[in-house]
């Protein structure tokens, strides 16, 4: 337990759980961990780009929402940070606090468009999926061709929460500028853990002085930080100044270096498909989607996948739901490339595809489907993989009444 009275709780829906978790955010963790992480992001960015002019404008943050009762504040971590930041932070960030904390997402987006279209925005931060929806609406609202015409001084997106690779092409299309930089952070409701400190690398520096004690699980064995090995993957456990003790985050990290300690997030401990012995993990899926999109000229906005179970007369398969920002030249070619890349990456999948599994099926859903699903379910992330059909069927239910816009390819 944390000493003293805890008045802030971060609501974390995770990706696969139906129940929200309420995580304590102590004053110590708020300033020693979360706020310090934000300061270090700025410091490390300046270290990489000394000629930056990012501080000559404002940072746009698309926060969540929070509620108050009996002196207790509960909400998304982003909302708690907005709620507790001092008044002078408004000199550096946008939109106004009242707008940032609005509960209705569509109303929030419209107000941000009105308030921020004429601001000098030099950076934005947050989860890629929600920011992509906002920025696309900003381009529509202003009637411009892309975001560079709206905010010509824009240079930084500090992103976290989900893997960025599936969104990279969409952001590059929206912000066609060689001066735009993308900086990954590993921050969550539970704490702030790592920052990308070198743009030439695809990993992050593990932050060791934020009030968090790290342990790592490899199967049944748990090792301290000094016991990890480069190239190995571990489930991460933390004990921290917010009162969490040996708490398993559900993330799988891979160490790329032990001097200094560098990691990349390789996936989730519970996000996989293994209905037929194929053992497909999130990293396989993200890579396959990226390759298929590049090969067919597509931009993928969101996706999720799960099993279609075997029947008496039919083979099992993987079923994908995909929302495109730009449709592929050929849907069939996209599915074939996706399938082929999964077979190349995963020998278990290849073996099953050549025997007991049918080719994958793909549902193409209208733009905004996943955003509506997340709002309805109170989630901030789309689960990429699930070993059952609950997410698949729930997302497809969101398209009710729009069946003409939904296709199945296989």
Explain the meaning of each model-derived region.
Residues 19, 55-57, 153-154, 180:
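Short coil/turn connectors at secondary-structure junctions
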Residues 77-410:
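Active-site glycine/GP-rich loop and adjacent strand/helix microenvironment
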Residues 1-11:
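Conserved pre-ATP/AMP-binding loop-to-beta segment of ANL
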Residues 23-24, 136:
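Short, solvent-exposed loop/turn and secondary-structure capping segments
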Residues 2-4, 53-57, 354:
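Short coil/turn segments at secondary-structure boundaries
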Residues 41-89, 99:
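Conserved AMP-binding loop of ANL adenylate-forming enzymes
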Residues 9-23:
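Conserved adenylation A10 loop of the ANL superfamily
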Residues 25-48:
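Conserved structural elements of the adenylate-forming
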């Amino acid at each position: 337990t944390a000493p003293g009275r805890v008045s802030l709780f971060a609501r974390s829906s995770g990706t696969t759980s139906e129940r929200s978790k309420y995580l304590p955010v102590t004053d110590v963790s708020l300033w020693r961990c979360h706020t310090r992480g934000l300061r270090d992001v700025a410091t490390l960015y300046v270290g990489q780009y000394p000629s930056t002019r990012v501080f000559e404008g404002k940072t746009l943050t698309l926060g969540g929402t929070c509620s108050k009762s009996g002196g207790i504040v509960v909400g998304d971590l982003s909302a708690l940070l907005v709620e507790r930041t001092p008044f002078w932070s408004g000199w550096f960030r946008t939109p106004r606090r009242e707008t940032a904390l609005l509960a209705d997402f569509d109303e929030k987006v419209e107000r941000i468009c009105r308030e921020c279209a004429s601001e000098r925005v030099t950076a934005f931060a947050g989860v890629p999926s929600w920011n992509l929806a906002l920025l696309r609406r900003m381009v529509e609202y202003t009637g411009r061709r892309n975001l560079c015409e709206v905010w010509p001084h824009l240079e930084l997106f500090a992103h976290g929460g989900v893997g960025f690779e599936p969104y990279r092409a969409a952001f590059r299309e929206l912000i066609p500028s060689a001066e735009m930089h993308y900086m990954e952070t590993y921050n969550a409701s539970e704490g702030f853990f790592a920052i990308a400190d070198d743009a030439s690398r695809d990993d992050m520096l593990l932050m060791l002085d934020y009030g968090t004690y790290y342990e790592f699980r490899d199967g049944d064995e748990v090792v301290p930080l000094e016991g990890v090995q480069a190239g190995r993957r571990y489930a991460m456990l933390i004990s921290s100044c917010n009162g969490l003790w040996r708490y398993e985050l559900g993330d799988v990290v891979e160490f790329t270096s032990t001097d200094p300690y560098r990691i990349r997030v390789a996936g989730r401990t519970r996000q996989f498909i293994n209905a037929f012995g194929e053992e497909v993990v999130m990293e396989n899926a993200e890579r396959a989607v990226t390759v298929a999109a590049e090969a067919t000229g597509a931009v993928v906005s969101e996706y999720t996948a799960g099993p279609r179970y075997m029947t008496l007369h039919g083979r099992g398969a993987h079923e994908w739901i995909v929302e495109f920002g730009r449709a592929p030249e050929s849907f069939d070619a996209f599915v074939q490339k996706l399938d082929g890349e999964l077979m190349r990456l995963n020998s278990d999948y290849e073996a099953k595809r050549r025997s007991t599994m049918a080719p994958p099926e793909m549902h193409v859903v209208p733009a905004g489907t996943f955003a509506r699903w997340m709002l309805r379910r109170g989630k901030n992330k789309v689960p990429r993989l699930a070993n059952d059909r609950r997410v698949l069927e729930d997302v497809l239910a969101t398209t009710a009444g729009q069946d003409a816009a939904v296709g199945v390819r296989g």
